[in-house]
A protein has these predicted regions:
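Flexible, low-complexity junctional segments that flank or bridge functional domains
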Residues: 1-186
Length: 186
């Protein structure tokens, strides 16, 4: 993802290019974990920078363009270029909220919460999640209807298919750190 990785990261990834099929055969997922660790590091760096940017008011009077889809663009080559990209992204996010009639304090609150939530989700991913993502990426190249279920997902699937789930009968939603009851299930 060109919002996280830089050109200098590509040689690091290339050393694993010919090993990915070996990972599938051997079950040694260390190369995948190495790649994920770099992703987690880059996400932490960029999102920390984005949150820190909110300490200062953003100038909406500049005439700049933000390109979210960067697939056709070259990889950024330096931390400074990555910070510039994130400045543009945060400015774009803040501008969208401003256009939705949020005041500056509201913008800070929403964006801080958003960026921290992304970081929290990335940091909550465990080795099973990383393996599941990798294996699903592989299986979908062969068949879009095939997927790998991690042990946790497999257990949830078994419960759903057996219709034997026993619990409090409520549909729950995680809202920030609080659990909210959406509805009671008869």
């Amino acid at each position: 993802n060109k919002h996280y990785f830089r050109a200098s990261d590509i040689p690091y990834f290339n050393r694993y290019r010919d090993l990915l099929d070996d990972v599938l055969r051997s079950g040694d997922f260390n190369p995948i974990f190495d790649i994920f660790r770099l992703y987690r590091l880059r996400a932490q760096q960029n999102l920390d920078y984005a949150i820190a940017m909110l300490d200062e008011p953003i100038d909406f009077t500049t005439n700049k363009e933000y390109l979210f889809n960067r697939t056709e663009l070259p990889w950024l080559s330096s931390p400074e270029e990555m910070q510039q990209l994130w400045r543009e992204r945060v400015t774009n996010d803040a501008l969208n909220l401003s256009l939705a009639d949020k005041d500056w304090d509201g913008i800070i609150k929403v964006l801080t919460k958003r960026y921290k939530r992304v970081l929290k989700r990335i940091n909550q991913l465990d080795s099973d999640d990383v393996v599941e993502t990798f294996l699903n990426s592989f299986t979908r190249t062969l068949d879009p209807h095939s997927s790998y279920l991690s042990p946790r997902q497999s257990e949830e699937y078994k419960i759903q298919m057996s219709l034997s789930y026993q619990g409090i009968g409520a549909s729950l939603k995680l809202d920030d750190e609080l659990v909210a009851v959406l509805n009671i299930i008869p």
